[in-house]
């Protein structure tokens, strides 16, 4: 009888879970099941696996928080690192240095933003957009083109003020033309952020990224102003003759109506300012370019002068976009770009450009929130495993951060669903 009693006491312990069920549900993409639930069929596994991220699993009860008297919520990045370490068994030995670096970047960006806001407030010409008669409207189309990872997306995003194209440390993160719109007083400037272009040493475009190259080269003559941008820091540290050849080729394309501008980007990374003078002299007499600007697309240096120049080039022409509304098409595109940016940040050396990224569902719910469903389609199962991560940690992290950013951009609740499939 003693043996039977001992067995009965031990039996409940065999089904215990080492990780807290609450934490596992709150931070992992894997839905939880009880013993009473049925075993899923094979076709159901797609929706009940680590390969699915559903932001509703991560929502807090805002009503209860308000009732408890919580006035503000402060998020400490260290909490996320601790959770990753405890729940996903990730190494956090370098977390402290990462936090310091992240905090430093945030402080710098906050200071730069505050400075820009102050300058805008002191600028008498800077006024809210009101009703402008069609006959008084001015517009300008601007194409931004350059070598891969030259900073085209960061420049567009900073000037426009809304994330319109994926910004990441990886090369070729822009896969198609994206429209950004800046409306100031009676002038509207439409920016087209083109895919990264690169030439072989022979001067011929690469064929391995055919779609990106064809889209970029075919769009060169379509705009009123063409901005050719290159990474001046890389040009000084790791010179690439292909970049110079690209700049020369664009400048040699004949056009009577289009104005071309050469932007030396990422000047904030150059410590010796005399080096910038040398680069400026190198490209000073290059034919085909009307103006030269030294800028930082990430931190905003020189962009006020660039924006002023573009405003002066605007012509009498009705606006193409409504300055007061963000169209659904733009919102869909932003949702894809934000998720893609997070994907490129967390999937480092592993084939991000072979992954198909599709918007599968978009619905505005009665309460004003958005339900967004996106799918990642990988060529191989091994690539799917990389993207999903251990216990869904990678796709979960991508989903959490993308959902936070989309809520901030759209100023409403967002229900984001990410699913990883194999082609």
Curated annotation (Swiss-Prot):
Key words of the record: GTP-binding, Nucleotide-binding, RNA-binding
Domain KH type-2 intervals: 347-423
PROSITE patterns named in the record: G_ERA (PS51713), KH_TYPE_2 (PS50823)
GO biological process annotation, one example: ribosomal small subunit assembly
Sequence ranges assigned to domain Era-type G in this UniProt record: 138-316
SUPFAM superfamilies: P-loop containing nucleoside triphosphate hydrolases (SSF52540), Prokaryotic type KH domain (KH-domain type II) (SSF54814)
Region of interest called G2, as start-end residue ranges on this chain: 172-176
Region entry G1, spans: 146-153
GO molecular function: GTP binding; ribosomal small subunit binding; rRNA binding
Binding positions (GTP): 146-153, 193-197, 265-268
InterPro entries linked to this entry: G_ERA_dom (IPR030388), GTP-bd (IPR006073), GTPase_Era-like (IPR005662), KH_dom-like_a/b (IPR015946), KH_dom_type_2 (IPR004044), KH_sf_prok-type (IPR009019), P-loop_NTPase (IPR027417), Small_GTP-bd (IPR005225)
Region described as G5: spans on this chain: 295-297
Region (G3): 193-196
Gene3D superfamilies: 3.30.300.20, P-loop containing nucleotide triphosphate hydrolases (3.40.50.300)
Residue segments, region G4: 265-268
Protein function: Has a crucial role in plant growth and development, possibly by influencing mitochondrial division.
Family (UniProt): Belongs to the TRAFAC class TrmE-Era-EngA-EngB-Septin-like GTPase superfamily. Era GTPase family.
HAMAP family documented for this protein: GTPase_Era
UniProt-listed PANTHER family: GTPASE ERA, GTPASE ERA, MITOCHONDRIAL
Protein name, UniProt field: GTP-binding protein ERG
């Amino acid at each position: 009888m003693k043996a039977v009693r001992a067995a009965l006491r031990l039996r409940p312990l065999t089904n215990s879970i080492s990780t807290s069920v609450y934490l596992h549900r709150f931070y992992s993409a894997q839905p939880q099941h009880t013993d009473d639930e049925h075993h899923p069929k094979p076709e159901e596994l797609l929706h009940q696996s680590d390969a699915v991220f559903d932001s509703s699993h991560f929502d807090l009860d805002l009503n209860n928080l308000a009732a408890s008297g919580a006035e503000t919520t402060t998020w400490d990045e260290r909490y996320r690192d601790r959770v990753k370490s405890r729940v996903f068994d990730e190494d956090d030995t370098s977390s402290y240095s990462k936090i310091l670096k992240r905090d430093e970047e945030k402080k710098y960006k906050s200071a730069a933003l505050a400075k820009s806001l102050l300058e805008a407030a002191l600028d008498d010409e800077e006024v809210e957009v009101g009703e402008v008669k069609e006959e008084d409207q001015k517009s300008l189309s601007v194409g931004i083109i350059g070598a891969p990872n030259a900073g085209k997306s960061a420049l567009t995003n900073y000037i426009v003020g809304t994330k319109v194209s994926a910004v990441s440390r990886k090369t070729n993160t822009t896969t198609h033309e994206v429209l950004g719109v800046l409306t100031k007083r009676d002038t509207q400037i439409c920016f087209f952020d083109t895919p990264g272009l690169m030439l072989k040493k022979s001067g011929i475009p690469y064929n391995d990224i055919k779609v990106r190259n064809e889209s970029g080269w075919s769009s060169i003559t379509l705009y009123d102003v063409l901005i050719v941008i290159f990474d001046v820091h890389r040009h000084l540290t790791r010179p690439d003759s292909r970049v110079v050849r690209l700049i020369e080729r664009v400048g040699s394309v004949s056009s009577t109506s289009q104005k071309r501008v050469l932007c030396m980007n990422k000047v904030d990374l150059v410590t010796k300012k005399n080096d910038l003078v040398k680069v400026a002299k190198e490209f000073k007499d290059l034919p085909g370019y009307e103006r030269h600007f030294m800028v930082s697309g990430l931190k905003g240096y020189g962009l006020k002068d660039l924006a002023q120049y573009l405003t002066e080039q605007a012509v009498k022409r009705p606006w193409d976009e409504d300055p007061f509304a963000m169209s659904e098409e733009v919102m869909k595109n932003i949702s894809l770009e934000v998720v893609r940016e997070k994907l490129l940040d967390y999937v480092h050396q592993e084939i991000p450009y072979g992954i198909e990224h599709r918007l599968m569902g978009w619905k505005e719910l009665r309460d004003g929130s958005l339900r967004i469903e996106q799918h990642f389609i990988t060529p191989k199962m091994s690539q799917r495993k990389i993207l999903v991560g251990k216990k869904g940690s990678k796709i979960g992290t991508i989903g959490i951060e993308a959902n936070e950013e989309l809520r901030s951009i759209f100023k409403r609740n967002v229900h984001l669903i990410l699913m990883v499939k194999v082609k």
